[in-house]
């Protein structure tokens, strides 16, 4: 009886897993096996999954899956903002050509237009009951694409014409799923999409001081956040990515914050609901490699 009372007071609960989730990973066709930590993890533990990319998404094939994973994808049409450092590298040029070919094949004059169409399908997928888990640049760039759909944030090296210098005045945050009131960093030579990200601040903290705390939730009241924060430790070692985390002031109040760096406004883990579905954002690239 004492154990039963404690069980109730602590807020524990039992959740039945009624079916095996069918998983899709959004990944470009030229991605190497070691480029995506998620694929490595799924392969290692032998969890089956399918790969999908833009064509499959626009064909409506996401409805066949329960769980969609996005990793370090750029949905703004700026190819990861790698131009300054890698603009002449063969892998960058191949990535650019692959995306341009797909845009042309599917009837879009710009890659940014293709990616916006894909993001709308991702939003529809969640709204219809799917679960989407995103990491790294896959966290913020969908909302940046949605907010900037009525202007042009891509400079000439990305789509052949200049960006709108007043793009930040034309952002529509009502289109966004997670973020609001952010500003886009339009300099194509700066490896950063917007002021949402915390990477520059985090670098000043240093690897050995970077820990974030997973929040506690009652499994009886909040079963999904409770499942998402199950871990052997409440203090998790931080790590970087193109998008390492999110400044709290830019997160919509309807979101559930799952983890933060103590004493800061650095949010590392977010969960939200949309329609019949849910989505989760986790900052950083590879937990086993700080930088």
What are these regions (language model features)?
Residues 1-36, 45, 283-284:
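Hydrophobic targeting/anchoring helices
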Residues 7-11, 55-57, 264-268:
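Alpha-helical scaffolding within the catalytic cores
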Residues 13-14, 57-59, 115, 245-248, ...:
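Short, flexible, glycine/charge-rich loop motifs used to bind or transfer phosphoryl groups or to couple energy/partner
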Residues 17-19, 60-65, 249-252, 273-274:
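Flexible, charged surface loops at secondary-structure boundaries
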Residues 24, 28-139, 145:
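Helical hinge/lid and interdomain linker segments adjacent to catalytic or ligand-binding clefts
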Residues 36, 43, 140, 159-160, ...:
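Catalytic beta-strand/loop cores that center a nucleophilic Ser/Cys/Thr
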Residues 92, 107-108, 115, 147-150, ...:
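Catalytic cores of eukaryotic secretory-pathway lumenal/extracellular enzymes that build
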């Amino acid at each position: 009886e004492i154990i039963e009372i404690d069980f109730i007071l602590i807020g524990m609960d039992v959740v039945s897993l009624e079916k095996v989730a069918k998983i899709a990973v959004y990944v470009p066709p030229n991605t190497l096996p070691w480029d995506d930590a998620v694929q490595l993890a799924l392969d290692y533990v032998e969890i089956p999954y399918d790969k999908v990319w833009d064509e499959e998404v626009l064909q409506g094939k996401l409805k066949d899956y329960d769980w969609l994973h996005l990793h370090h994808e750029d949905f703004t049409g700026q190819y990861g903002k790698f131009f300054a450092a890698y603009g002449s590298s063969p892998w960058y040029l191949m990535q650019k050509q692959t995306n341009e070919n797909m845009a042309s094949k599917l009837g879009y004059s710009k890659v940014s237009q293709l990616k916006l169409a894909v993001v709308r399908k991702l939003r529809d997928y969640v709204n219809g009951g799917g679960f989407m888990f995103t990491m790294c640049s896959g966290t913020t760039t969908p909302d940046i694409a949605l907010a900037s759909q009525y202007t042009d944030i891509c400079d000439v090296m990305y789509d052949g014409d200049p960006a709108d210098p007043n793009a930040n005045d034309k952002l529509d945050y009502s289109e966004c799923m997670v973020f609001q009131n952010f500003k886009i960093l339009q300099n194509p030579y700066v490896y950063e999409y917007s002021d949402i990200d915390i990477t520059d601040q985090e670098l000043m903290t240093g690897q050995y001081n970077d820990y974030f705390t997973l929040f506690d939730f009652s499994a009886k009241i909040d079963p999904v956040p409770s499942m998402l924060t199950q871990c052997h430790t409440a203090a998790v070692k931080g790590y970087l990515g193109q998008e390492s985390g999110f400044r709290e002031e830019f997160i919509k109040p309807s979101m559930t914050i799952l983890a933060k760096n103590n004493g800061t406004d650095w949010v590392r883990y977010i969960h939200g609901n949309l329609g019949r579905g849910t989505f989760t954002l986790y900052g950083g690239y590879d937990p086993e490699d700080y930088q």
